[in-house]
């Protein structure tokens, strides 16, 4: 069984037992959270789409860890003008383990 969930402005296809990194969620480590924005639920060949959400469906997950992704470097330069600008960004994430899909 799998589900398509929406969290942090992104969509993820998840199954029970998987781990995934999502945008940071303010929750403690080992806390159980419920993701209610389920867009689709499928099992085998049958799939149920929501309009836009599947009513009564939810995904239970456990917070495994919090962290930061690898640094994305930004470099701007104007040729022949001796202008260089360096920058960087590291996005925070929350790693979740999917425990159950309730449809």
Curated annotation (Swiss-Prot):
Database matches in SUPFAM superfamilies: L21p-like
Q: Can the keyword Ribosomal protein be found in this entry's annotation?
A: yes
Which superkingdom, per the lineage?
A: Bacteria
Instruction: Work out whether the entry's keyword set contains Coiled coil.
Output: no
Question: What keywords are assigned to this protein?
Answer: Ribonucleoprotein, Ribosomal protein, RNA-binding, rRNA-binding
Q: Name one GO molecular function term.
A: structural constituent of ribosome
The GO biological-process annotations, alphabetized, read as: translation
GO terms under cellular component = cytoplasm; ribonucleoprotein complex; ribosome
Function of the protein: This protein binds to 23S rRNA in the presence of protein L20.
Q: Which family does it belong to?
A: Belongs to the bacterial ribosomal protein bL21 family.
Cite the PANTHER family for this sequence: 50S RIBOSOMAL PROTEIN L21, LARGE RIBOSOMAL SUBUNIT PROTEIN BL21M
Q: Share what the entry says about its subunit structure, partners included.
A: Part of the 50S ribosomal subunit. Contacts protein L20.
Q: What is this protein called?
A: Large ribosomal subunit protein bL21
Q: Which organism is it from?
A: Burkholderia mallei (strain ATCC 23344)
Source gene?
rplU
